[in-house]
């Protein structure tokens, strides 16, 4: 997911997309793409928005198979309005602003352990200064998401989901919070165990500089 405008990172995003900001001598999105290219995946897709042509050109050179223009759309729009809606298989969802060590073997094992749910969020331990949706669970079933009711875990931005299953059991929604709300009501939103690999989210210029120091 790389269509965000990145307003909180102005002026760095005045003339480029958030995904194309320089991070440790590479593009911010390149941290994940480099890892994904080494995995046995059927395809890699990205969403683009602001300065989408520039990002799409870079992504294709980096081995991305599908580009979806979601400019001025919500972050879940692609799931109901592109060919991915027909995908009846696990789809790993990442955000371009995460600095994360992708342990696909662990994520896949968690997905199978929880009986291949419609949607599974990957929680992390909260990091000071980084906002997130706090997750309340009962036997790994998510019963509430909140920005104010603090819990020991919150969403990392990493999910594994089945687009066709989601289309079959929810009404169209533009943003993930509305999708998750529908799934919670049907007891279909699951949380994995807490992710312990490297994870950091970049939403501001200060966080970018912090990440550069932490993950050089």
Predicted regions and their residues:
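Conserved catalytic core of nucleotide-sugar-dependent glycosyltransferases
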Residues: 131-142
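Short, structured coil segments at secondary-structure junctions
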Residues: 16, 61-63, 138
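Catalytic-core segments of class I nucleotidyltransferases/pyrophosphorylases
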Residues: 92, 99, 108-112, 126-127, ...
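Conserved N-terminal catalytic core of the sugar/cofactor nucleotidyltransferase
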Residues: 22, 26-106, 171, 204
């Amino acid at each position: 997911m790389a269509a965000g405008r990145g307003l909180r990172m102005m002026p760095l995003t005045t003339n480029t997309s958030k995904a194309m900001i320089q991070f440790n001598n590479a593009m911010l999105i390149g941290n994940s793409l480099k890892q994904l290219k080494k995995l046995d995946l059927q395809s890699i897709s990205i969403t683009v928005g602001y300065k989408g042509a520039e990002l799409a050109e870079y992504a294709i050179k980096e081995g991305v198979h599908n580009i979806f223009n979601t400019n001025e759309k919500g972050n879940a729009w692609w799931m109901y309005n592109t060919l991915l809606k027909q995908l009846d298989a696990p789809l790993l969802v990442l955000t371009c602003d995460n600095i994360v060590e992708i342990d696909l073997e662990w994520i896949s094992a968690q997905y199978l352990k929880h009986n291949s749910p419609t949607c599974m969020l990957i929680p992390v331990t909260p990091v000071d200064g980084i906002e997130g949706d706090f997750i309340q669970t009962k036997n790994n079933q998510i019963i509430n998401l909140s920005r104010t009711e603090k819990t020991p875990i919150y969403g990392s931005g990493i999910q594994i989901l089945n687009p066709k299953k989601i289309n079959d059991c929810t009404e169209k929604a533009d943003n993930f919070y509305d999708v998750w709300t529908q799934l919670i009501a049907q007891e279909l939103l699951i949380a994995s165990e807490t992710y312990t690999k490297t994870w950091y989210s970049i939403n501001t210029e200060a966080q970018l500089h912090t990440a550069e120091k932490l993950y050089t």
